[in-house]
Amino acid sequence: MKIGAFVPQGWRMDLNGVTQEKQWQTILDAANKIEKLNYESLWVYDHFHTVPKPTQDPTYECWTLMSALSQTTNKLRLGQMCTCNSYRNPSYLTKVASNIDVMSGGRLEYAIGAGWYDHEYKAYGYDYPTAGIRLKMLEESLIIYKLMTTEENPVFEGCLLYTSPSPRDATL
């Protein structure tokens, strides 16, 4: 069995009471402890607001955290539980994920879903499509992710999403 753990990042109000000046150190300390205890992986949530009640309390963005933690840990696999597909363009997200995978020495775990937290969509100006449309977007995004990591000149035109030829990214 392989075991991972989450670092605090604010989404579950797990940084409440920690001053802003000490929040990053709190996250780092948790990551270091997870690594010292020989866990296999470290996880973050892909959310922008707290839950169960949206507040203005700090919530650290997952891809920014994984980028930083890729440089402050040595052996932990790094994952998101799970990336909301419709928060980021699939071509852009593939680029970010590929970069972090390279920066971390191949330690990225890539988990993605269709999204559900309507408050975050609205707060950040994203459309909140029906579940069926979000699932279709996820389906097309997975094709784009695969093409961008395996094809020399990836091109895709779906019902909802498309991509033009772009440089091939590092393999996820």
Where are the predicted features?
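Flexible, glycine-rich active-site loops centered on histidine and acidic residues
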Residues: K2-K22, N85-V155
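Single conserved hydrophobic/aromatic residue that forms the stacking wall/gate
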Residues: Y162-L172
